[in-house]
Swiss-Prot record:
Residues 1-76, 133-173, 235-243, 305-315 are cytoplasmic. The gene is Paqr8. Plasma membrane progesterone (P4) receptor coupled to G proteins. Seems to act through a G(i) mediated pathway. May be involved in oocyte maturation. Also binds dehydroepiandrosterone (DHEA), pregnanolone, pregnenolone and allopregnanolone. This is Membrane progestin receptor beta. InterPro entries: AdipoR/HlyIII-related (IPR004254). Residues 98-111, 195-213, 265-283, 337-354 are extracellular. One of its GO terms (cellular component) is plasma membrane. GO terms for molecular function: steroid binding. Non-classical progesterone receptors involved in extranuclear signaling are classified in 2 groups: the class II progestin and adipoQ receptor (PAQR) family (also called mPRs) (PAQR5, PAQR6, PAQR7, PAQR8 and PAQR9) and the b5-like heme/steroid-binding protein family (also called MAPRs) (PGRMC1, PGRMC2, NENF and CYB5D2). It is found in: Cell membrane. GO terms for biological process: oogenesis. Keywords: Cell membrane, Developmental protein, Differentiation, Lipid-binding, Membrane, Oogenesis, Receptor, Steroid-binding, Transmembrane, Transmembrane helix.
């Protein structure tokens, strides 16, 4: 018995030693990674206010930027927050499907599927932008334009889900005619405004750049959240008992907090150079936007299950199909806008280098 116990302890000790060596083994298994550099060693385009170090050097092979997912630099938290959020969305939706709650053959399910697609799209586009933008100036513009297309798609995917599953009758009777066309236009305008601001203004960025980004995105949010905000307000005034309404409330609160950190460079403004790797405002923005999306997903899944009869009373298959088709039209228009401005950026960079 004593011998068996000692053998087991020896095995556990060896396992502990192997676990402690795991980070070193992983590091040795990866290609040799260039060290990060200070802001003075990267072009002006890549520098962020109050972030003094942790930049990845430009001009390396694509492999380096993909493997930088496992390197300590000033974008890695931005990448991982949205990577983990995308995995969480997929796992939560998979659990929902496994529970038998999804009606695959029903038009009732299409807006939910598009919302899941839009959520994964914006999270993936965002993490790719932060992971790969450092390769070159053209890559920087290209991947951020892709990011803006993802945001536009997510805005309209949210609008579809809120319209079909979450709106109450009083709001629906007032706004049903023009809500989706207006949401599609605001989604495209948000993408166009962000792409134009990125193309037009150079560092150090003027206030007008932030206005071009924030105002269209703010309009899109106010419109897209209006069915939810109306329902949540009425619910809380009546002593809210709906679980979905509480998740919608969290969604709104998390988004407002994330919007603040997107708009204001805090806390790095007050601690320059101390938040280079962890703790700067854009990372906090990513974290709150991720939990906003997860709260929104929970609310929409509850509405999908609990408000099925309301959906059937309001919407026929044709209206659902046409609304869902508009999702792909918006995605195409946003992608075309981003592509056009990318060509303009490419021409400008060619002229600069010639």
């Amino acid at each position: 018995m004593t011998t068996a116990i000692l053998e087991r302890l020896s095995t556990l000790s060896m396992s502990g030693q192997q676990l402690r060596r795991l980070p070193k083994i992983l590091e040795e298994g990866l290609p040799k990674m260039p060290c990060t550099v200070p802001e003075t060693d990267v072009p002006q385009l890549f520098r962020e206010p109050y972030i003094h170090a942790g930049y990845r050097p430009t001009g390396h092979e694509w492999r380096y930027y993909f493997f930088s997912l496992f390197q300590k630099h000033n974008e890695v938290v931005n990448v991982w927050t949205h990577l983990l959020a995308a995995l969480a969305v997929l796992l939560r939706f998979w659990a929902f499907v496994e529970a038998g709650a999804l009606q695959w053959a029903s038009p009732h399910t299409l807006p939910l599927l598009l919302f899941i697609l839009s959520s994964i799209t914006y999270l993936t586009c965002s993490l790719l932008a932060h992971l790969l933008q450092s390769k070159s100036e053209l890559s920087h513009y290209t991947f951020y334009f892709v990011d803006y297309v993802g945001v536009s798609v997510y805005q309209y995917g949210s609008a579809l889900a809120h319209f079909f599953y979450s709106s109450d009758q009083a709001w629906y009777e007032l706004f049903w005619i023009f809500f989706l066309p207006a949401a599609a236009f605001c989604g495209w305008l948000s993408c166009a405004g962000c792409c134009y601001a990125k193309y037009r203004y150079r560092r150090p960025y003027p206030v007008m750049r932030k206005i071009c980004q924030v105002v269209p995105a703010g309009l899109a949010f106010v419109l897209d959240i209006s069915p939810v905000a109306h329902r949540v307000a009425l619910c809380h005034l009546a002593g809210c008992q709906e679980q979905a309404a509480w998740y919608h409330t969290l969604q709104i609160l998390f988004f407002l907090v994330s919007a603040y950190f997107f708009s204001c460079p805090v806390p790095e403004k007050y601690f320059p150079g101390s938040c280079d790797i962890v703790g700067h405002g854009h990372q906090i923005f990513h974290a709150f936007l991720s939990v906003c999306t997860l709260s929104q997903l929970e609310a929409i899944l509850l509405d999908y299950q609990g408000r099925h009869e309301i959906f059937l009373q309001r919407h026929g298959p044709l209206s659902v199909y046409s609304a869902c088709l508009s999702f792909f039209v918006l995605a195409a228009c946003s992608a075309a806008t981003a592509t056009l401005l990318r060509h303009k950026v490419k021409d400008r960079l060619i002229k600069k280098d010639s």
